[in-house]
Structures are given as structure tokens and as C-alpha cells.
Amino acid sequence: MGVFVILLHLNKIKMKKIKVLLGLFIISASLSGQTRSFGEKIEEGSIIENSKIQNLFLAKEKFNAKLKAKVTDVCQMKGCWMKLEIGDEKDIMVNFKDYSFFVPKNIIGKEVIVSGEAFKRNISVDELKHYARDRGENESVISLIVEPKEIYSLTAKGVILLP
């Protein structure tokens, strides 16, 4: 009789654990379809179309921008930068204002909305190599980086990760 009571008690404990785990699973599944924000809140307003953003880079030295784009690369060390595709095989390198926030490292292929100051800049060989290491490139690939490059850049105040 005592063994039966012990087994019954153990089954009740297991059922409680299963119910808790099931509840956590349901909560996490419901949250996965929501947007996630990083940094400052992005204000309502118009988003610059990707087809127009390149013209702004050509026409202005610096400008405030809010755009929606697909993430093509993310720092695999801590999520401290990302690249966004804007069409015509062009990317924007996004850093985060004062390194005050980071993004998840597993968002390549996801869409984001970013808001911040956009500008063109020359990036040194050392910095290009640093970013290659952050991406996890091997030294044979890194050794091929021998020239600085002009890039489109954006210092983001805020990021919204879309579902």
C-alpha cells in the first residue's frame, strides 16, 4: 500500500511539471508572432522606400532615415551590428547608437524597421577585417581584405524586429 501511495504522489508531481511546461510552451508560441523592439521607440511616420534610399545617399551627406529592410548579416559575437539589403546588391551597415543596445544574432533573413542617422563613410581595412571576424570568417578570407571601402551606414536609435 505504501509503494502505491508513493507512486501516486510521484505521478501528481510529474503531471504538475507537464502542465507548467505546456503552459510555458503555449505562452512562448503566442509571443513568437509579435514584433520586438530594441533601443528607442520608433515614432509613427513614413518609411523611406528602399528604391529611394540610394538617391538620398547620393544627394545628401547625412539624413534621418526610417526604413524597412531584410537583414543579410549580423555580428555573431554579440549582435552589435547588422547589414540590411536595400536592393541593387546594396547593403546598409547598421550600428547602434552609443552601443546602448544589440539585436539577436539569429535574425538573418528577417525584416526589420530601423530609424536613425544615415550617411556614407569610408571603412578601413582594419575595420573590415574586424567585421569579418565578427561574422566568423576564417583567416584565409580575412587575408583577402586589402582595400578600404565606401559603404552606406546608419546609426540606429531604434530597431523593430518584425514577425
Q: Model-predicted segments: where are they?
A:
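OB-fold and OB-like single-stranded nucleic-acid-recognition modules
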Residues: 34-163
